[in-house]
Amino acid sequence: MSEQALETIKEQIETNPILLYMKGSPQNPRCGFSQRTVDCMMHCGQKFAYVDILENPEIRSTLPSYAEWPTFPQLWVDGELVGGCDIVYEMFESGELQNLLDNASNDFIE
């Protein structure tokens, strides 16, 4: 596990209340799971940061060990791992994702 990549991951998670590690970008997702996750998040209407793991191979190889979550995408809210595509979709369907994202954004508005 790269120490530099680990420090970068920690900083990204700490400084972004809503962060999505994904393949591609929200405008151009490069896998179906990332596309589905972005669709759910965009529908909720909150701004979020993202990291394209295809452009960041050290983060791609380090994050699964750090997060103890082997797959991408990964949604992080307020420094906590929410989960991947299936969990995000289930939360979206139940309305829980909207509440989570609304509350995360409200925590950082002053």
Predicted regions located by residue number:
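Non-catalytic, surface beta->alpha helical segment in thiol-disulfide oxidoreductase systems
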Residues: V77-I109
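Local sequence-structure signature of Cys/Sec-based thiol-disulfide redox active-site neighborhoods
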Residues: K10-K47
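Acidic beta-strand-to-loop metal/phosphate-binding motif
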Residues: Y21, Q74-D78
